[in-house]
Amino acid sequence: MILDGKGLAARRLELLKEDIIEGGLSPTLATVIVGDDPASHMYVRMKHRACEQVGISSVNISLPEDTTTRTILERIRQLNEDPDIDGILVQLPLPKSIDTEAVLAAILPEKDVDGFHPLNMGRLVTGLPGPRPCTPNGIMTLLHENKISIAGKRAVVVGRSVDVGRPIALLLLHADATVTMCHSKTENLKEITKQADILVSAAGKAGIITADMVKPGATVVDVGTNQVNGKLCGDVAFDEVEKIAGAITPVPGGVGPMTIASLMENTADIARNRCGHFM
């Protein structure tokens, strides 16, 4: 079974558009991007198109590559204090000269649509309500909507990034999966992944997951976005793994669209909460 993130995301965005209209909301998302990385600018454009689609206003602050941390912090302070801005997103990765942790921590937790503020990460760890990181949240929605059983299953996450690997492991744990995390120092990776009922790869390395690493019938979630010979591909060797997996996400068209949908939902939720219309 192909887990169609593109189709599901489109349906969820249409429902969100209706909710925004019926709720009389007028959410506004501010994005901050630093530098000229083509991929980052492409992702920001996609997010703004989604905003337009569902009725969320958006503003983009584009800063040059040589911008200082202090300058970014000042722009974030202004956005924090702006009553018309509901959500703030800083497009990652930032240039190496920027203190990314300081930048993310400067965003007001109640305007943090990405869920990366330390307070919101703490809420994720403890299971308290709060905005969840968009890619992991999108993955969980994709699994739930496709009736993929999680409770009691063995889940393996390849990759320990703060934005995907660690939070998806926590969300799976909260859903009562038995979770194992793997990373660049993990020994016997194949032996571990082959035990997984649910295998999530967020390693950022094209083709790292091959058919001999996958348990027959497993659900395989490919978070990778890699460029190989000018073509977008994931971490999973799709053609061979699809033959033995019970369910698998394609790249493109799997996790990516769900990430965008989750961002839009987070923005609308934050706008509701700031207006006092708690869900």
Curated annotation (Swiss-Prot):
Pathway: One-carbon metabolism; tetrahydrofolate interconversion. Its EC number is 1.5.1.5, 3.5.4.9. It catalyses: (6R)-5,10-methylene-5,6,7,8-tetrahydrofolate + NADP(+) = (6R)-5,10-methenyltetrahydrofolate + NADPH; (6R)-5,10-methenyltetrahydrofolate + H2O = (6R)-10-formyltetrahydrofolate + H(+). It comes from the Archaea. One of its GO terms (cellular component) is cytosol. The keyword Plastid does not apply. GO terms for biological process: L-histidine biosynthetic process; methionine biosynthetic process; purine nucleotide biosynthetic process; tetrahydrofolate interconversion. GO terms for molecular function: methenyltetrahydrofolate cyclohydrolase activity; methylenetetrahydrofolate dehydrogenase (NADP+) activity. Keywords: Amino-acid biosynthesis, Histidine biosynthesis, Hydrolase, Methionine biosynthesis, Multifunctional enzyme, NADP, One-carbon metabolism, Oxidoreductase, Purine biosynthesis. NADP(+) binds at residues 159-161, 184, 225. InterPro entries: Aminoacid_DH-like_N_sf, NAD(P)-bd_dom_sf, THF_DH/CycHdrlase, THF_DH/CycHdrlase_cat_dom, THF_DH/CycHdrlase_CS, THF_DH/CycHdrlase_NAD-bd_dom. PROSITE patterns: THF_DHG_CYH_2. HAMAP family: THF_DHG_CYH (MF_01576). Belongs to the tetrahydrofolate dehydrogenase/cyclohydrolase family. Catalyzes the oxidation of 5,10-methylenetetrahydrofolate to 5,10-methenyltetrahydrofolate and then the hydrolysis of 5,10-methenyltetrahydrofolate to 10-formyltetrahydrofolate. Homodimer. This is Bifunctional protein FolD. It comes from Methanospirillum hungatei JF-1 (strain ATCC 27890 / DSM 864 / NBRC 100397 / JF-1).
